[in-house]
């Protein structure tokens, strides 16, 4: 029985005669004798002869139904009282230990047999259930206790990852290596919650060394073919890591482009899609190979995609050169950008937004090589007036104060232009005495988008 057909039956609980025969054979084979530790005698018999629901329940939570039910019935306010909180904490730990014990048994079964590729997805199901259980019950735990359970959970999941990674079976149909991505996604999710950059780096190095981060090779991965959501999650974490931590924006936008192109249209209003498109827009702008004036979506769009994309304020600022609104955007969301790891990227985009303003003024000036700073200041003031609020309104008509304000603005523009020249985004030089910029006649904006 093919792996893909097995997974399909397993997910839908559509148990054909072929599926029952397949599971029955696996249960009776010598390498999988440890299944008796999971199933009781009568349950094993039922699972072997047709009651496959018993097998599924055993793999996922057969020993934990009562504990899980009691946890669901808990009053969330019970965590307020310390004595009840201790009881809840102990119950969560007991359930977690039972779940991880089941997972360790399954890992042994998975490791002992070369032909147990069929068990990869059920093991992932248990890992996913453990991680979901920890996230759902986190409100009952103190921060330190929660982190300890997360770290223990990561170790058990990593064991499943290494079993799949170390499979040397030359028959690719029976090789478990393709399942590494399933477990890697769970690990990266925990590392993100723990904000453990070093462990994320180590895991991605392993994935890079085996070629799993190569987008062209992902097309041949049967797990990613079967589970499109896993492909989206995997490339999201990889793209986020390359962009937020390594500042390799070309690689980052390539992985996020896969996420955008694979994302189901009916879910484009979800926070996941908004998060992906936000990162994709940032990194596409900063990718050195991108020389488009504005970022295009990588595939034919429909109304939902277009709406989700065009509503992005950052992209509008980039297209219009609206430095005022963009500065306000950074100030308003600075804390969130720091948490997400995108603050540095936003500062780099701020430079591009200002560059866009300079280029618009250059075109308005008929592309002459001498560009007065007063013209750039005029463009700056247009956005300044459009962004009308109490803070930005000019409250004085005193000529001296207005002159001082104008001089301060020109000084600020000089500094920002000098920064662009130093970074190679503008080819030219500043004339401080003439308050103008002299641009190259052949290539004034060598790295401009």
UniProtKB/Swiss-Prot annotation:
Localisation per UniProt entry: Cytoplasm; Nucleus
Presence of the UniProt keyword Transport in the record: no
Protein name as annotated: COP9 signalosome complex subunit 12
Superkingdom per UniProt: Eukaryota
A Pfam family this chain is assigned to: PCI
Role played: Component of the COP9 signalosome (CSN) complex that acts as an regulator of the ubiquitin (Ubl) conjugation pathway by mediating the deneddylation of the cullin subunit of SCF-type E3 ubiquitin-protein ligase complexes. The CSN complex is involved in the regulation of the mating pheromone response.
Keywords: Cytoplasm, Nucleus, Signalosome
Family that this chain belongs to: Belongs to the CSN12 family.
GO cellular component, one term: COP9 signalosome
Native source organism of the sequence: Candida glabrata (strain ATCC 2001 / BCRC 20586 / JCM 3761 / NBRC 0622 / NRRL Y-65 / CBS 138)
Stored InterPro entries: Csn12-like, PCI_dom, WH-like_DNA-bd_sf
Main location per the UniProt record: cytoplasm
GO molecular function, one term: double-stranded DNA binding
Domain PCI: 233-444
Subunit field text: Component of a COP9 signalosome-like (CSN) complex.
Gene3D superfamilies documented for this protein: Winged helix-like DNA-binding domain superfamily/Winged helix DNA-binding domain
PANTHER family tied to this protein: PCI DOMAIN-CONTAINING PROTEIN 2, UNCHARACTERIZED PROTEASOME COMPONENT REGION PCI-CONTAINING
UniProt signal peptide: none
